[in-house]
From Swiss-Prot:
Gene source species: Meyerozyma guilliermondii (strain ATCC 6260 / CBS 566 / DSM 6381 / JCM 1539 / NBRC 10279 / NRRL Y-324) (Yeast)
Pfam name, any one: Slx4
InterPro entries hit by this protein: Slx4_ascomycetes, Structure-sp_endonuc_su_Slx4
Keyword Metal-binding part of the UniProt annotation: no
Subunit structure: Forms a heterodimer with SLX1.
Protein name as catalogued: Structure-specific endonuclease subunit SLX4
Task performed by this protein: Regulatory subunit of the SLX1-SLX4 structure-specific endonuclease that resolves DNA secondary structures generated during DNA repair and recombination. Has endonuclease activity towards branched DNA substrates, introducing single-strand cuts in duplex DNA close to junctions with ss-DNA.
Cellular localization per UniProt: Nucleus
Family in the record: Belongs to the SLX4 family.
Top-level division of the source organism's lineage: Eukaryota
Biased amino acid composition, Acidic residues: 265-281
Bias (Polar residues): 251-261, 288-305, 518-528
GO MF annotations in UniProt: 5'-flap endonuclease activity
Record key words, sorted: DNA damage, DNA recombination, DNA repair, Nucleus, Phosphoprotein
Length: 681
């Protein structure tokens, strides 16, 4: 054994020496290589440029780019070599019903265009006619609006637009036989007839050079007789110039009525006119309107004035004396003409110039205040004189004040643009009469009577015997029992003198024991005494008794459900259930049923304790300041306050945990809960 160990040790020693020798040689070689690397860095850099051979490029197939997607699609799916439509439809994921509907619509459209147009339409190489999306006039309008909307375009784009315009004019000259007006022509020709150069210059903010060339482009040399401008919506709704008047004008010796102006001119009038003067003005207006009937000869006036709420009844009427002619006001901020307005002739109040006059409003009553313009217009048409078989109804209800035309501002007109700021119309309110509502006042008295009570019948008094109140504070009335307790409620009407005496009695000048007087809607309600519920708890607890047919097990189960501490005697359990029933306003029998609402009863007990705490300032401040409440003191204070609130420390601890009140258990050095106390844990 020893020889083997010796041999192994010698072998290990030789291996170790050999390993040390190899490690020393490697260290020497690394030192030599490190010293030689310094000379390697000092070698000069070569100035020869080496050419890197690139890999040979493979011959790629040149793919022809698709010049037109339409040509590509037509080349892929056109019918050739007797190919059927079913083969084409199968290519579209077997959705034959969708493709069939599309093809039928395209074929119907092409056939309809070919039949409707007399002149041959341009066709492609395949002979298929193409449908015309826009007419020539529509293309002209599109190009003009592009130039106005984008005045700073590139030279290439501007040249393209000019080329398209030239082609369209050439086609227009060729097809000049077609005189049917298109939609764009009708829409564009309406506002262009009534505009002048100053209006165009103001509308598009053009300079003299742009006005000379007739476009917003500075270097456009195309000749065009038509104007290259577009109007706003409010100006497009203006009336077109006509050579003949649309309405019949009757001239008489009566003074010219004042023009009906914008809504912003109407102001609210003070209530200074008497009722007699209003009635006289109404009678004069009705006589004057009925004496000179006039028929409106055109329907355009009615269509153009449908948006005017204040004259909606006049435009539909056929019994008005005279009309107003169309007037054009060359104001810079309002580029339109006033529409024809039919106004009845009313006499002026004063002959002085620029005096304010009063015109009648629409025949809508003051109490008919509509929320939407749709309803307002419908009701105005229904109430107009024309809807009453030609009979003129009563018009003026509330006067409106209008200013004279000389006082008008430039920004106030019938049609306003974006630069004007019209004000809203103010409606004149009628006379309001303050009527005092007469209310009767009653006095209610509740009297507690012990024993048999007899009262003579009387017409002035109403005797009500309270039975089974919800709150449980009032018990059943048993007049046959001499030792029972009754509560009688007496209600009768009182006058002001009696009410004053009642207020003095409630404030504390007179105290009549348990009698409580309640006067609804009187100023003394805030100083009433405590509610009848808190005063009758002791009476209810005395009268309620536990029926004898219930066992102690049932009562113990009810106490356990209410989290009450267990009682040893049956009388103690009955007393606890009686106190809980009196506070919750229910009977003891209802607490002993299987489906009794124990959670609701427990919440009512918690509410009764909370109300008692809120009425005492000291205990309420302790709770609000998070001062730890000593449970023994709290129990003693509740027992002295009301015998129905006698609970043990365990139940009060559950109440405090439920309400989030801090508590502690310790001894006190004070005598009562109202003094300063110290607690020791």
């Amino acid at each position: 054994m020893s020889n083997d160990v010796y041999f192994e040790s010698i072998h290990m020693q030789s291996n170790y020496e050999e390993f040390e020798t190899q490690a020393q040689e490697r260290e020497n070689i690394s030192k030599i290589s490190t010293s030689l690397s310094k000379f390697r860095k000092m070698s000069p850099k070569s100035t020869r440029s080496f050419k890197v051979k690139s890999a040979p490029l493979t011959n790629r197939k040149a793919r022809n780019r698709i010049k037109s997607i339409n040509a590509h699609v037509s080349a892929q799916y056109k019918v050739s070599n007797g190919q059927q439509n079913d083969d084409i439809l199968d290519f579209f994921l077997k959705r034959k019903h969708n493709i069939s509907s599309i093809l039928e619509g395209v074929e119907d459209l092409e056939n309809r265009n070919i039949v409707s147009n007399d002149t041959p339409q341009p066709s492609d190489n395949t002979g298929n006619y193409s449908s015309q999306l826009f007419t020539q006039e529509e293309w002209f309008q599109i190009l003009r609006r592009i130039k106005l909307r984008f005045p700073k375009l590139s030279a290439r784009t501007r040249k393209s637009l000019k080329y398209v315009t030239t082609k369209l004019e050439h086609l227009k000259n060729i097809n000049s036989d077609d005189d049917s007006p298109q939609l764009w022509t009708q829409a564009a020709s309406l506002p262009e007839e009534g505009l002048v150069n100053e209006d165009m210059k103001w509308l598009y903010e053009l300079d003299d050079e742009q006005m000379d060339i007739g476009s917003s482009f500075c270097n456009v040399d195309e000749d065009s007789d038509q104007k290259l401008f577009v109007l706003t919506l409010s100006q497009a709704m203006g009336e077109r110039e006509k050579s003949e008047p649309d309405v019949e004008i009757i001239s008489d010796s009566s003074p010219e009525p004042t023009q009906l102006l914008n809504d912003g001119i109407i102001e609210e009038e003070h209530e200074v006119d008497e009722e007699e003067e209003d009635n006289e003005n109404e009678e004069k207006s009705e006589k004057q309107l009925a004496s000179s009937p006039t028929q409106i000869s055109s329907d355009d006036t009615q269509e153009q004035l449908t948006n005017r709420a204040e004259i909606s009844s006049y435009e539909a009427s056929s019994l008005f004396p005279n009309t107003l002619e169309t007037q054009k006001q060359p104001v810079k901020s309002t580029i339109q003409k006033q529409a024809s307005v039919v106004v009845p002739d009313y006499p002026k109040i004063s002959n002085v110039k620029d005096e304010e006059i009063i015109l009648s409003s629409s025949p809508t009553r003051d109490n008919e205040i509509f929320q939407t313009p749709r309803k307002y217009s419908v009701e105005s048409v229904r109430s107009s004189p024309s809807s009453r078989s030609g009979r003129l109804g009563r018009l003026m209800v509330s006067p409106l004040k209008l200013l004279s035309p000389d006082r008008l501002d430039a920004s106030q007109s019938v049609y306003s643009t974006a630069r004007s700021s019209p004000t809203k119309q103010k409606r004149v309110r009628g006379r309001e009469v303050n009527e005092k509502i007469v209310r009767k006042r009653f006095k209610t008295s509740r009297v507690e009577v012990a024993g048999n009570f007899h009262l003579k019948a009387s017409d002035d008094l109403k005797i009500v015997s309270t039975v089974d109140k919800v709150n449980g504070s009032e018990v059943e009335d048993s007049e046959d029992d001499d030792h029972s307790v009754s509560i009688i409620e007496i209600t009768h009407e009182v006058n002001d003198e009696e009410l004053k005496a009642v207020d003095e009695e409630v404030t504390g000048e007179a105290e009549d024991g348990p009698s409580i007087i309640q006067v609804p809607s009187s100023p003394g309600n805030e100083n009433l005494q405590e509610d009848l519920t808190s005063m009758q708890t002791s009476i209810a607890s005395v009268t309620q008794e536990v029926p004898s047919n219930y066992t102690a097990t049932q009562m113990r189960q009810a106490l356990r459900s209410l989290d009450f501490p267990p009682e040893r005697s049956k009388e103690g359990m009955a007393s606890s259930l009686t106190r809980a029933a009196s506070i919750a306003g229910t009977s003891v029998s209802s607490l002993l049923t299987p489906d009794a609402p124990y959670e609701e009863v427990k919440n009512q007990i918690y509410s009764a304790i909370s109300e008692s705490v809120k009425k005492d300032q000291l205990w309420h401040e302790r709770v609000l300041s998070y001062e730890p409440i000593v449970l023994e003191e709290f129990k003693q204070w509740l027992g002295e306050l009301d015998k129905d609130l006698k609970f043990d420390v365990t139940f009060l601890q559950q109440y405090c945990d439920h309400m989030g009140i801090t508590t502690t258990i310790g001894t006190t050095t004070g005598t009562t809960a109202g003094t300063n106390t110290t607690t020791t844990d």
